[in-house]
Amino acid sequence: MQTKAEKKEISPETMRAIYEEVKTPFKAGMALAPEPGEMLDSPVVFRHGDAWFMVFIRFDGKGYETHLATSSDLRSWTRLGCIFRRGEKGQWDQAQSDAWPALVDTRWDGPNTLNPFDGRYWMMYLGGAKDGYETDPLSTGVAWADAPSDLRRWTRYAGNPVLQSSDADARDFERATIYRHFTVEDPARSCGGRFVNFYNAADAVSHREAIGMAVSDDMLHWRRVGDGPVIENGDPLKHSISGDPMIRRIREVWVMFYFGHQWKGSIGAFDTFACSRDLMHWTKWEGEPLVQPSEPYDACYAHKPWVLKHDGIVYHWYCAVSRNADGREIRGIALATSKDM
């Protein structure tokens, strides 16, 4: 007789089938290349009307701000500018404003649109008061707009930040800082709330990053779920990363794409996945990464996934990192696909 834990496990055959469905062995080069003095990061792609949009992060040497680009074919992108700026001086998010749309339709063969709640379209964002690249501590904010077309007019929630590493109920794995979120609607409420928020965070010992979860019924008030992370890798006492989760629903299986670093041999940062039937118990893929460093433009890192399927082709955008002659990082957004484009 199977135990309850064994029933939650995803079989090796199913894991292999998911890998074959989502793999993207063909690299198509840079989708958005950085200009001098900037680094680009963390793509989110969705459809509205007849156009595709990409929300991405721009680092200008001071901190993060959130930008937008558009495309008609998912390959050529035109920048539209900044849509979510840093907060006012003296505010908790005065130096960092890394936002991403929430409630994306997760269906693998779905329309890849944004779903509204309470008549609004939502974003989660990480914010911070200190200059620099992801300087601790970072906390979580919420913002909304009245329609996807209002991408330049987002209202910050007055009760921000909604999740902080200093919260009394923060768990050990999130005591240093909180990073990127992916929020999914769960009609079954299998985790205890209508909305489930997966996010990576760092502990205060080795700054090891793992992925945990929180739930909400209104997108504003969040309750942490569980005593620890749902995805973790590597030695708990050594720095490593399991980060930037995003989720799709492939038939009856939830698939979490995320990136790993410093726990899988000597390769640089890479993208992989895990699977679940209930959003709480996850089986990690132990095989070949979905993308990993292999080209001059991603020689250091190929990480931070955004994956979707459209017209039978799987598209996998990621942050590609290399270094120039003086050792400085070059960060842009690259694309890999399931078919040779």
Task: Locate the predicted segments by residue.
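Beta-rich carbohydrate-recognition and catalytic domains
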Residues: 1-99, 103-179, 184-240, 248-300, ...
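Acidic/His-leaning functional-site neighborhoods
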Residues: 304
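Conserved GNAT-family N-acetyltransferase fold
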Residues: 245
